[in-house]
């Protein structure tokens, strides 16, 4: 019984971690009606809710800390986003940074949008 419990615990942990790793694979939609989150790109990081670094590999896009990997298919994405022209139409305001060390949340109350 103890071995079964340990096995189920490990399988659950692996499943949970796999879900978190995939959390930042995003797809850019052509329509706001297909999107999970409407995003506006700010000119300054001080105006942003989230500073985003575009990863070159899906394996670098971990957790919910602003490391995004853009996928080619909406079926591979955890979140579908649509870029809007006005910050007033956006659910989330982001700023693209040049280093993954600069990525992260500036407004923690919006974190649930990307889970």
Regions of interest found by a model, annotated:
Residues 4-16:
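Sec-dependent N-terminal signal peptides
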